[in-house]
Swiss-Prot record:
Keyword Manganese: no
Protein name per Swiss-Prot or TrEMBL: Proline--tRNA ligase
Keyword Ribosomal protein: no
Domain notes: Consists of three domains: the N-terminal catalytic domain, the editing domain and the C-terminal anticodon-binding domain.
UniProtKB keywords: Aminoacyl-tRNA synthetase, ATP-binding, Cytoplasm, Ligase, Nucleotide-binding, Protein biosynthesis
EC top class, as a word: ligase
E.C. no: 6.1.1.15
UniProt superkingdom: Bacteria
Protein source organism: Aeromonas hydrophila subsp. hydrophila (strain ATCC 7966 / DSM 30187 / BCRC 13018 / CCUG 14551 / JCM 1027 / KCTC 2358 / NCIMB 9240 / NCTC 8049)
Role this protein plays: Catalyzes the attachment of proline to tRNA(Pro) in a two-step reaction: proline is first activated by ATP to form Pro-AMP and then transferred to the acceptor end of tRNA(Pro). As ProRS can inadvertently accommodate and process non-cognate amino acids such as alanine and cysteine, to avoid such errors it has two additional distinct editing activities against alanine. One activity is designated as 'pretransfer' editing and involves the tRNA(Pro)-independent hydrolysis of activated Ala-AMP.
Subunit structure: Homodimer.
Organism lineage: Bacteria, Pseudomonadati, Pseudomonadota, Gammaproteobacteria, Aeromonadales
Gene: proS
Length: 574
């Protein structure tokens, strides 16, 4: 491609509304332009990257035995009502009506559509397993679109759905898709981790996220420094402290703590470490037959954070997790929020494993302006349960039993689920088994954020000059930068020759034939992130050489004119 025949819309300045590096560089490199909040037009360079990622995903899906289909973006509301998700989804589900006032949705995902399709096309176990996928635009009306294509309202996604006669078959395909995802992200040159994850609104049982490690990531992941264990912070298990709980030695004492509310304030006032304090949070339980909700006390160590996903999965706790308001706190504990404690609390008490290991600890006295010191489980709190309630912290022992946990930020680029029969049962998708009996199909679903991958790759691969693309997904593999070619016929001829040879070898090459200063050309090629560059000048041609430059390492070397094409083909594996 010649730049004179190409739309190379680079910007010198960073747009003020671009918050993270990938958004800034995608705008500056002329990859995308904003159309509306969370909606972007893809310019040629951006689309070239998007298509390369899409092709890698498609190849790995085909290798895994999945079959490509295409389904409508607009979906009948009745399918969502049938599955039960019409009421589960909030404003992020874009609902619309046609001219006949029939309700539809803009699809954020396609579980309902694919289940409806398969229930009418598949009726025998002989047609299973079946794995169907598509690569298609989705729409979610995000409350706060941000970070460019990282969290847009419109996005390109690969979604696959598998159907099975039994759980064993589902697990087999799930593992095959897990391997396909790893292969795809490895081919893209990404540093990623598959991690255990929560199923969220999609539902089902087993689930893994694929996280690209990046400081700008919205997710926090925990992984062992020794083994392959990795989990989203929501799912990472916090083990109980080793050994027996220390024996009680202090007497229970009530102390005045006026105008002291937070853990840090209590620690400073009483001159104790936050880890020696038990903090108590009150949440609501599930509604009983009369619509009443009990108030439940969750007790954690003062230096630990509540994991709300773990908490709302506890039996009897309202889902979604709902914290008690001031009025409910007053009624249940008889005090303000800053003075709640487990001693004397009349309701159900659930202590985190680490909190349950405390002895002689500080806690609220259930009297505004007072705390207790020397509190102890069993002696002072007779009835309580113990559960894993907290987020893990760096240095915790890994749940796998090997090594300690490290915490890193990640960008979720893929998510796979063992759905089980959540959708197939609700939508009556069944087949006849070998014995002629009707059985509900087991399902899996597998998503990849194709457009998000573009941004995630940039977050991992950039420097002060611009993007540093992995070769497999770069918009161009080689840039030809001729110095003053419009004033030097032999520079122009040599550039034309390299361009023809590289194109004939199947290399994606960008020939910068603009009438621009060399500094502008170099800056644009570095901003765009082309992995390899040939710089041609009269001085080098006098000596029979050109300059080769590697974008990732910054390496420069003079190479004989007769050898440069072979060198590039070798580096690109041609």
């Amino acid at each position: 491609m010649r730049t004179s025949q190409y739309l190379l819309s680079t910007l010198k300045e960073t747009p003020s509304d671009a918050e993270i590096v990938s958004h800034q560089l995608m705008l500056r490199a002329g990859m995308i332009r904003k159309l509306a909040s969370g909606m972007y037009a893809w310019l040629p360079s951006g689309l070239r990257v998007l298509k390369k990622i899409e092709n890698i995903v498609r190849e790995e899906m085909n290798n895994a035995g999945a079959i490509e289909v295409s389904m409508p973006v607009v979906q009948p509301a009745e399918l969502w009502q049938e599955s039960g998700r019409w009421d589960d989804y909030g404003p992020e589900l874009c609902r619309l009506t046609d001219r006949h006032n029939r309700p539809f949705v803009l699809g954020p995902t396609h579980e309902e559509v694919i289940t409806s399709l398969v229930r009418y096309e598949v009726n025998s176990y002989k047609q299973l397993p079946l794995n169907l996928y598509q690569i298609q635009t989705k729409f979610r009306d995000e409350v706060r679109p941000r970070f460019g294509v990282m969290r847009g309202r419109e996005f390109l996604m690969k979604d696959a759905y598998s159907f099975h006669i039994d759980k064993a078959s589902l697990i087999e395909t799930y593992e095959r898709m897990h391997a396909a995802y790893c292969a795809a992200f490895t081919r893209m040159g990404l540093n990623f981790r598959p991690v255990q994850a929560d199923t969220g609104s999609i539902g089902g049982t087993g689930s893994h996220e694929f996280q690209v490690l990046a400081e700008s990531g919205e997710d926090l992941i925990a992984f062992s420094d020794t083994s392959d264990y990795a989990a989203n912070i929501e799912m990472a298990e916090a083990l109980a402290p080793a050994g027996e709980r220390p024996a009680a030695t202090a007497a229970l004492t009530k102390v005045a703590t006026p105008a002291v509310h937070t853990i840090d304030e209590v620690a400073a006032f009483l001159n104790v470490a936050p880890a020696a304090i038990a903090k108590t949070l009150l949440v609501l339980g599930e509604e009983d037959e009369h619509g009443n909700q009990a108030v439940i006390a969750l007790v954690l160590r003062g230096d630990h954070e509540l994991n709300e996903i773990k908490a709302e999965k506890l039996a009897g706790v309202a889902n979604p997790l709902t914290f008690a308001n001031d009025e409910q706190i007053k009624a249940a504990a008889g005090c303000d929020a800053g003075s709640i404690g487990p001693v004397g609390f009349a309701g159900r008490i659930i202590a985190d494993r680490s909190a349950a290991h405390l002895a002689d600890f500080v806690c609220g006295a259930n009297e505004t302006g007072f705390h207790l010191t020397g509190a102890n489980w069993d002696r002072d709190i007779a009835s309580y349960e113990v559960a894993d309630l907290r987020n893990v912290v760096e240095g915790d022992p890994s749940p796998c039993g090997q090594g300690k946990l490290l915490l890193k930020r990640g960008i979720e680029v893929g998510h796979i689920f063992q759905l089980g029969t959540k959708y197939s049962e609700a939508m009556k998708a069944s087949v006849l088994n070998e014995g002629g009996k009707s059985v509900t199909m087991e399902m899996g679903c597998y998503g990849i954020g194709v457009s998000r991958l573009v941004a995630a790759a940039i977050e991992q691969n950039n420097d002060q000059y611009g993007i540093i693309w992995p070769e497999a997904i770069a918009p161009f593999e080689v840039a030809i930068v001729p110095m003053n070619m419009h004033k030097s016929e032999r520079v122009a001829e040599q550039a034309q020759q390299f361009y023809a040879e590289l194109k004939a070898a199947g290399v994606d090459v960008l020939f910068d034939d603009r009438k621009e200063r060399p500094g502008v050309m170099f800056a644009d090629m570095e901003l765009l992130g082309v992995p390899h560059a040939i710089v041609i000048g009269d001085r080098g041609l006098d000596n029979g050489v050109v300059e080769y430059k590697c974008r990732r390492t910054g390496e420069k070397q003079e190479v004989a004119i007769s050898e440069i094409v072979a060198l590039l083909k070798a580096k690109l594996g041609r």
